[in-house]
Amino acid sequence: MSLTIASVNVNGIRAATKVRNEDSLGMLEWLQHTSADVVLMQEVRATEEQAHAALAPALDEGWQLVVAPAEAKGRAGVGILSKHSLIDVHTGIPGFETAGRFLAGTLPCGTRVASLYLPSGAAETAKQDEKYEFLDQFEPLLAEWAAQYPQMVIGGDWNICHRREDLKNWKTNRKKSGFLPPERAFMDSVFGAFPDDEAQDIEDKANAGWAGAVEYGAGDAGDPAPRTAAAEPAWFDVARRLSPEAAPYTWWTYRGQAFNNDAGWRIDYQAATADMLARAQRSWVEKAGAVELRWSDHSPLLVEYADGGGA
């Protein structure tokens, strides 16, 4: 049987599952109809008990839940909803063990799935330093996991647009976290330059270099590591690989008419190993039909993977 994986930043699970009116029924109603077998959730912003309470109707219908809350209450938090029990569950990465930003487990079929919530950052603040530190810790783990788990998908809110095509108004966002040169260079190092032959020119002269709170000296530990596009990547942006020029946006600010005007950002990704990319059949975003029907500022990103022959 095929395996469908969804990834979505729920923007607070208690708010996402709230029924607002007879038309806006929230995430629980979406779970009743989704084709997903696994839902990778980010920004859960709840304790384990609160998350189980919010999702109780879905759990009663057979969904199983694992969560990794952030130590700081009301912040971050990741979770995995699955129709099958997970084994070999792991939370956190070095330096961010209790930050509620990474959770992985293996399905009975052998596919390993992970939910990632990368720090959002904020240019010229300590939050951007935190984001760069996370990237530095995360990058070597990607190489380890690709070798250890040939069939693995890391879905989540990466909080970075890789290419100009990944946001509506790229020219006005060149100095904002989520589209800074070091962030985009990180994505190049993970996914390569596809579909371009070479990486896009990301060293905008008005915004090149460091954008954290502290200007580090060359070679200092805090300086974002120089990165180049991977010639032979171990991870693949599934949506972009399946739709080289048309991968849709996944996030729209609540401000103004961004949703109605489709002024969005593509910051949610499913990163797959080569074996999983070979199984990927189709990818799509389930965008709400109207702004008042949204239960998060993100929309679910889904990918259907063909049967891999596991038990």
Regions flagged by a language model, labelled:
Residues 284-311:
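Surface polyanion/phosphate-binding segment centered on an Asp-His-Pro turn
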Residues 1-57, 72-75, 205, 307-311:
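N-terminal, active-site-proximal structural segment of metallo-dependent hydrolase catalytic domains
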Residues 73-89, 260-279, 305-306:
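Conserved beta strand-loop-helix elements of the APE1-like EEP
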Residues 61, 136-267:
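Metal-dependent phosphoesterases centered on the DNase I-like endonuclease/exonuclease/phosphatase
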Residues 44-123:
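Structured beta-strand-rich core segments of catalytic domains in phosphoester-bond hydrolases
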Residues 76-78, 99-104, 266-268, 296-302:
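Short hydrophobic/aromatic beta-strand or adjacent loop that forms the aromatic wall/cage
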Residues 5-10, 30-50, 113, 142-164, ...:
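Active-site beta-strand/loop signature of hydrolases that rely on acidic residues for catalysis
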Residues 15-16, 46-50, 124, 161-162, ...:
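Active-site environment of divalent metal-dependent phosphoester hydrolases
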